[in-house]
Amino acid sequence: MNYYGAAALALPWIALPIATLVRARRSRSLDEYSEDAPVNAPLVSIVIPARNEARNIERCVRSVLASGYARLQVIAVNDHSTDGTGTILSRIAAEDSRLVVVVPEALPAGWFGKQWACTAGFAACHGEVVGFFDADTWQTPDLVPRAVNAMRNREADLLTVAGRQELGSFWERLVQPQMFGIMLARYGGTELVNESPRVSDKIANGQCIFVRRAAYEELGGHGVVRDKVAEDLAMAQVYFVRGKRTVVILGLNQLSTRMYTSLRELIEGWGKNVYVGGADSMPGWHRLRFLYPFALVMPALSGLVPPVLVG
């Protein structure tokens, strides 16, 4: 095969990453905002829903308590865990009075557990700004003050932070970059999302969402997305439709998470987010669900095709 033939075969594998990188450049970061609390800093309440998160919860909670933001309230919701999560939270609460531990009432019909836990946590909040964090996240001390400053600067009713993904196992390193690459190719950089006039382009990262209390209450809190699998995406779209300002921002130096640790967790987790959650957000997705298992590994394996064809 001559040079031109090889180049033609390789072009699709070169063009897509380049196009994705160009689109991703239109992004803004928390690094642009001050790590010092603003003048007249609002009280910020952080809600951490946790169900059977003994592996992660202590690191998450302690990272929040170590925040450089002074006016902070932390509420951890022990969602009827059976793995020791409650014991860990009780121990931390005994050491630090800023931590309030809440146990929600029984899950009512028509609700998903995370949304109900967030609702129970919000009931204990006093903050003008409320942050919802997944229990498998951890943050640096400057995340909250930078997020508050970004919310003020961008006049955001909802601000969601996209952090760094920690990858441990072989399957994580194979699958996670491909899945996030697909999402990046679809949505582009943060400013493409923020400036888009289309509701279908509005997204949020449920691992870290800040809301203005007034807007959250006005729209009905998590109750408005109580039956949605991809509740974060649905919330961003509800906010947009109702005339509220949503902002996606990078926090690669402030927020990190390890979503899954095994192939089984990857399949189950992305199954919720893509296979099921897609039905909530993309019309006609049910016709494409059969492609989901291939989507997990084919992007990575496709990288082998050009070398094989070229020889």
Predicted segments with their positions:
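Short, well-formed alpha-helical segments that are part of the catalytic scaffolds
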Residues: 26-33, 53-66
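Alpha-helical bilayer-embedded segments of polytopic membrane proteins, i.e.
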Residues: 1-20, 280-311
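Short aromatic/hydrophobic "clamp" motif used to bind/position activated sugar donors
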Residues: 118, 130
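N-terminal membrane-anchoring/stem segments of glycan-assembly enzymes
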Residues: 1-38, 176-177, 187-189
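Cell-envelope/extracellular polymer assembly enzymes that use nucleotide-activated donors
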Residues: 42-45, 73
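Acidic donor-binding/catalytic loop of UDP-sugar-dependent glycosyltransferases
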Residues: 84, 135-150
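Acidic donor-binding segment of Leloir-type glycosyltransferases
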Residues: 61-108
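Catalytic donor/gating beta->alpha subdomain of glycosyltransferases that bind UDP-sugars
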Residues: 151, 158-184, 214-217, 222-288
